[in-house]
Amino acid sequence: FGPFTRMDPGPMNYDYRGEQEACEMRLAFGKSGDVEIELIEWVSGGCPHKEFLDAGNEGMHHLRFIVDDLDSKVAEAQSIGYQSIWGTRYAEGLAVAYLEREGDPLILEFFENHHA
């Protein structure tokens, strides 16, 4: 995998379990073919990544799916028991949502990016 591209976007506001929360993370992305690995370093603020670390977990946290219409995919997932727990719309056509469902070990990430 690699090379890795690092992003340090600073604090950003997210809807986190129904509340607005500023969260800061450092990110690095590496690819091999069509597979991408994202390394996330939590820095500050409430988010699912901090929950994961506070619970003593390490390793794979979520699985990302690229979607054309974030809102419709979130609604579809909610219809089968998923709850949206974290997300934001960065700009028109650029948004993210994390979803969880009781009993599922991984969080789902839906990512809409019409700017790529």
Specify the residue positions occupied by each region the protein language model found.
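Extended intrinsically disordered, low-complexity coil regions enriched in Ser, Thr, Gly, Ala
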Residues: 1-8, 53-58, 68-90
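Short, well-structured hydrophobic secondary-structure segments
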Residues: 3-6, 10-13, 19-38
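Residues embedded in well-ordered beta-strands within globular domains across many folds
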Residues: 5, 64, 111-112
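A cross-kingdom feature marking solvent-exposed beta-strand/loop segments within repeated
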Residues: 8-22, 45-50, 59-60, 92-95
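Vicinal oxygen chelate
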Residues: 27-35, 52-69, 74-116
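Amphipathic N-proximal alpha-helical interface segments
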Residues: 31-46, 111-115
